[in-house]
Amino acid sequence: MPWDSASTDTQTTTVATTQTNSSVVNTSSVTTDETEGDISIELDEEDTTTSYNESEASKIELTQTSATVTGSGVTVDGSKVTITSAGTYVISGTLTDGCIDVNVSGKGTVRIILNGVNVTSSTTAPFIVEDAKKVVVTLADGTTNTFTDSTRATTDDEDYSAAITSKADLTFNGNG
């Protein structure tokens, strides 16, 4: 069922759209005509493709309270996993009371493949996009991926009211 939310205070709003026939969710800034209420969302091939080159991807295995990384572009500090470079990342496993944070300055797309992920957090959103040009998350076929947060998480800098939060273009695709 498609849904959207839009602010009436400005012409630039945040919209989330779900297309059940292709399992695509896109969150992006769009322009609306408040008089007409029209919303325009454009998806490109990068937003809808679920394929990736596994040999070029960094692997992140969540291990309850930390993570093991094979590849580059990732830092791990306890239960906080931070993606720091554009590229492709395959994530699997369970992270208890931690978060996956995307903090990439500059150009390029961050492609994240969720391959059986379960992340919980009592202190912050378990999936945060702080900075990136674009993030595309693919839900691997046949997997269950879960992000669970506390009722409302607050850090020194941010107040998160959702399990998944983004300050950049964020697209979900796939059938997992």
Spans of model-derived segments:
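A composition-driven surface/loop motif
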Residues: 1-176
